Amino acid sequence: MHLTAAQGWLELGNHEEAFEELEQIEATLRGHPDVLEVRWGIYASIEKWDYCLEIGSAMVRLDPARFTGWINRSFALHCLKRTEEAYEQLKEGLRRHDEEELIWYNLACYACVLGKKFEARKKLEKAIDIGGDGVKARALDDPDFEGLWRSGEKK
């Protein structure tokens, strides 16, 4: 009940109420990956990337079969200006989740930011193959791909 309420508050943009709902969850359950995922969302909404990194790392450690932990950890690293680390760690997640469009997409973003334009294009193509035209539209508006589009790679 509290987890669902926290998710609802987070979707409404009220991170304080979401946090209060999570605090009402029994202490022994607060480390559950579902709870951690919402907690990550709360801290991401207020750009507390150090906390997001801790939570994302815990998610990967507790449940490596859940792809969102890999995404959350690498995104926090990227936001902390540790994009090379984000890229390398997310490549580990790709070994387990090679059919997840968001992993391919984020790897493409990080590759582009790192100046690896050929890799970025290939990874973005794979993300589009998996996720369709919506992925392509999102990429066209993503500032992480600016270097790819400036170099004439727009398709």
What residue spans do the PLM features occupy?
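Alpha-helical segment of the N-proximal tetratricopeptide repeat
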Residues: 1-45
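Register position in tetratricopeptide repeats
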Residues: 11-12, 45, 79, 113, ...
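A conserved position within tetratricopeptide repeats
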Residues: 26-27, 60, 94-95, 128, ...
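Alpha-helical adaptor scaffolds
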Residues: 34-102
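TPR/TPR-like (Sel1-like) alpha-helical repeat modules
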Residues: 112-135
